[in-house]
Structures are given as structure tokens and as C-alpha cells.
């Protein structure tokens, strides 16, 4: 089973909790994230960047190969990050056969908010004190005037693509998404539900419908 990168986990918390599992062959130890991966739970933690995106994509593909009919849960606590890394995860979520249920714990901002709303319809959740933030993509470039113009056009094209994706999953128009993301737009869990970014605010485990008892 592909486990989580030790460096990623140490950088996030400074410590990797370990759990011991009793098997017919004796004891086996896992880091906590690999143990949860056995329950089809993937964590998207911290900044969305290429290495983290590769890790999440690999786990999505692995879980699909294990059981293409069983849902995958993606737990999100992220300030966002690189657009292309976020889109790599997004495309994989849409590509694989299992439904991907998303759950915001803490925050889902920028690219992470896009991934939150991209979960399977009816299976997008927030915990009650989570925060969600949407905005237009950020970009900066220094160089010759012609190159700056090229990068400005690319940023506008990326913005249009992101607006269309979010419009698809929230059932709003791209024009409304453009207006609402003109500046940082922070929402509570309830506001995110009203906006269409999620389907339900979870106040207890029973409502979530996850099969695991963890």
C-alpha cells in the first residue's frame, strides 16, 4: 500500500503518530495516515503543490484499483496553493470510477475550495466550524513587456476555466462566480452550503454515512 511521505507528515506536525494492528501473523505498525488509507480516507493537508498533488493522485488511483465500486473520502484542511497542482487532483477525482466524498475540516481556501466542491453530488460536507474561501487565481511575473502580456492572458484563461468548473459544481453561472471571486470571499460552513459549494454541514458522525468506525 502506498503510504504517506514521512517528510510531508513531519513538516506538517513534527511527529508521525503510529498505530499497532493485531493480525493473525502478529503485530503490525502503521503511521496513522496509512492506517486511515486502508479505510479509503485520504488527507489533503497544507499547501496544494506538485509533490502533495502527486501523492493524492497516486492514492486515488490505488484505491480505485483496490475497489472501483466503493467511495473514497477526501478530508481537506488546506489554504490552497498552485492551480495546476489542484487541477491535477481535480481531474483525477473526475476521472476515477469511485465517488469521491469531500469533507472540510478546518479550512478549504482557493484551490482547496475548488476540490471541496468537486466531490460527488450529495457527498460534499463541512464540519460546523470550518471556513471556506474562494477567489480569483493569483499570479505575478517580471520580465519583458511582451512576456508579461503573455502571462496576463494565461492568468485570465485560467480564471475562466476555474470559474466554469466551479459554476458546474455549484450550479451557478460563470458570470456570478466571476463576481463572487473578484476579491477573497470567506464563508462559514452554512454559507458554503447555501452557496452550493457543499451539500451538508455535519454535526455528528451518524449523518456522514461513512462506513468506517474510525
Swiss-Prot record:
Enzyme class name: hydrolase
Signal peptide extent: none
InterPro entries for the chain: ClpP, ClpP/crotonase-like_dom_sf, ClpP/TepA, ClpP_His_AS, ClpP_Ser_AS
Enzyme Commission no: 3.4.21.92
Subunit structure, as described in the record: Fourteen ClpP subunits assemble into 2 heptameric rings which stack back to back to give a disk-like structure with a central cavity, resembling the structure of eukaryotic proteasomes.
Function: Cleaves peptides in various proteins in a process that requires ATP hydrolysis. Has a chymotrypsin-like activity. Plays a major role in the degradation of misfolded proteins.
Recorded family membership: Belongs to the peptidase S14 family.
The name this protein goes by in its record: ATP-dependent Clp protease proteolytic subunit
Amino acid at each position: 500500500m502506498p503510504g504517506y511521505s514521512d517528510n510531508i507528515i513531519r513538516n506538517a506536525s513534527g511527529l508521525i503518530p503510529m498505530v499497532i494492528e493485531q493480525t493473525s501473523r502478529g503485530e503490525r505498525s502503521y503511521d496513522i495516515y496509512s492506517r486511515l488509507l486502508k479505510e479509503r480516507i485520504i488527507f489533503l493537508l497544507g499547501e496544494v503543490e506538485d509533490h502533495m498533488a502527486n501523492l493524492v493522485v497516486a492514492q486515488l488511483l490505488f484505491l480505485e484499483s483496490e475497489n472501483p465500486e466503493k467511495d473514497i473520502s477526501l478530508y481537506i484542511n488546506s489554504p490552497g496553493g498552485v492551480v495546476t497542482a489542484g487541477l491535477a487532483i481535480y481531474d483525477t477525482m473526475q476521472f476515477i470510477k469511485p465517488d469521491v466524498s469531500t469533507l472540510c475540516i478546518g479550512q478549504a481556501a482557493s484551490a482547496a475550495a475548488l476540490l471541496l466542491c468537486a466531490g460527488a453530488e450529495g457527498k460534499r460536507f463541512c464540519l460546523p466550524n470550518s471556513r471556506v474561501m474562494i477567489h480569483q487565481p493569483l499570479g505575478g511575473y517580471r520580465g519583458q513587456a511582451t512576456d508579461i502580456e503573455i502571462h496576463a492572458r494565461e492568468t485570465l484563461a485560467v480564471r475562466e476555466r476555474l470559474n466554469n468548473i466551479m459554476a458546474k459544481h455549484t450550479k451557478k453561472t460563470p458570470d456570478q462566480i466571476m463576481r463572487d471571486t473578484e476579491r477573497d470571499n470567506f464563508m462559514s460552513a452554512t454559507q458554503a452550503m447555501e452557496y452550493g459549494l457543499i451539500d451538508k454541514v455535519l454535526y455528528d458522525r451518524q449523518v456522514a454515512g461513512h462506513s468506517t468506525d474510525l
